[in-house]
Amino acid sequence: MEDGAKDDYIKDIYRHASPNADTDSFLGSPTVAIDSTLSTSNSLSNLNLDTNDSSSSPPAHNDDVPDIAEVLQEMLATTELPSSTTDLDYEPELDLVGGHRRNLGQLNDYGSPRADSFVSLDPPSIGTEVEQFLSKKKQFFILSSAGKPIYTLHGSDDVILGYLGVLQTVVSAYQADESGDNLMSFRAGKTLVVVAVEGPLILAAVSKIGESESQLRAQLDVLYTQILSTLTKNQIHRIYANQSNFDLRNLLQGTDVYLDALTREIVNGSPSILLGALEPLILRKSIREEIDGVLLSCRTPSLLYGLIVSDSKLANVIRPKKHSLHPPDLILLFSMLFNTTSFRDGEHWVPICLPKFNSTGFLYAYIHFFSKSSALIQISADKNAFFELREAKQQILSQMEDKGLIKALERAEERGRFKPVDVAVPMVRHFLYKSRAHVQYVMPSYETHYYEPHMQRGLLTFYHQLHAQVNSDSSRGSNNGWRFMHLVRNSCIGFAWITPSFELYCVSGPNVSRATLAASIHSIAKWVSQHRERLFVIGGAVF
């Protein structure tokens, strides 16, 4: 995207935050422009899709690729159909224990994504199903290497099958090429398509909202992690080794609700997924330490990890010394718990694969919501630990109730995030601060500048743009890990500052001087450092 186009794009973000915004101008048309750039794993080559341009040079790949690219261009531009230290369970039993063990799919006989968890990028649906499909600003596709559909964000099988067939053909053409290149991404106008090949699965993201390749690739990794939470990597490879055209939806039946919830979170602009970090619950240090003490005193021999989470925010963790769960696994787990209705009743005992912890085996999670939006999660490698962990839950909640800790959690949840005025930086409207050491982030509430959902969505889209810019080659920085980006627009000013210890992204109003903004940035970093033990979960309860 040229510099002028980038300027117009950012302006459009803030036009989108206005009730009179033109949503089509915000993100461009659904058709694909002629100029296209194609990226492979080992090289970057330019591919001109205009067959009338005799000056274009052929790509350095096999002869089939230009024709395939022309087919893809034509179809997209028309409305015609076209390692762990613990031994894990590799084939979890799905029988009931105490009436509570279910697999993730069985939970969704009655589960669904939360209705309040989605802010659409798109205008109201009009026209035919194909026209609606092509008008979407963002798409995700998951298919097998044989072209069988597994998941799509938008569109029925009747609409998507032709597109998936072309996508599978393009990917296969590059895999068959003797150069050893794999198709990584290609761009057509404002549309960026990013492809990830994970064994027998192909994942693709299509975005018209100015996201970078690395951002889309991180989103695809989250979706792949979601699939691995139900079927391990070994299971998937074994299935397709025996039957290459197998329909994986037969085994994932019932878990599409989690993919729906996760893609909604991505489309909403989730800071957790953007930053690859968890949001902690803001809690007094003394309260957090007291809860840690309860978790340690009630720990059972089979417990591997324990978590207390309030409205997707991490409050406490109990873990083995020198071992931590990975944020991508917890982002996945929190999305399943808090963005669907599957786990809200009673207690649950489910096998789950946490791929960043171990992608080849299952752990078992005991999940219990002890208030409307707070849950106790106990994770074990022992499939027979249900009753042991249930008893531990009763002891934990009894002690927390006696010490007033459940009420303390409820008060912290009611207070929510701190307000921008609490930080005493009046020129800053909003910011994201990520502690790289703790892999956690904090941000103020959206008031008073971003009180409407579409305003919040515009802000988060701008953060994605700022994140992409500061992590690009065009950002200013030094070789010691410091980078910064200063973006001046008509409606706002954005600033990103990356250091070895933190990442900070902030947005101010227009006409704020660079000196004032720099002083505000330093004030934010100082304030976070002063309150770090209240803002972040540091270490947790270690055994």
UniProtKB/Swiss-Prot annotation:
The name on file for this protein is Vacuolar fusion protein MON1
One annotated GO biological process: protein targeting to vacuole
Report keywords, A-Z. Autophagy, Endosome, Membrane, Protein transport, Transport, Vacuole
Family statement: Belongs to the MON1/SAND family.
Pfam families recorded for this chain? Fuz_longin_1, Fuz_longin_2, Fuz_longin_3
The annotated regions of Low complexity compositional bias extend over 41-57
Q: What is its main location?
A: membrane
Q: Which GO terms describe its cellular component?
A: fungal-type vacuole membrane; Mon1-Ccz1 complex; multivesicular body membrane
Q: Which organism is it from?
A: Yarrowia lipolytica (strain CLIB 122 / E 150) (Yeast)
Q: Where is this region: Disordered?
A: 41-65
Q: Report membrane topology.
A: Peripheral membrane protein
Supply the InterPro entries for this chain: FUZ/MON1/HPS1_longin_1, FUZ/MON1/HPS1_longin_2, FUZ/MON1/HPS1_longin_3, Mon1
Q: What does this protein do?
A: In complex with YALI0F03861p/CCZ1, is required for multiple vacuole delivery pathways including the cytoplasm to vacuole transport (Cvt), autophagy, pexophagy and endocytosis. The MON1-CCZ1 complex acts at the fusion of vesicles with the vacuole, through its regulation of the SNARE complex during the coordinated priming and docking stages of fusion, and particularly at the stage of tethering/docking.
State where the protein is found.
Endosome, Multivesicular body membrane; Prevacuolar compartment membrane; Vacuole membrane
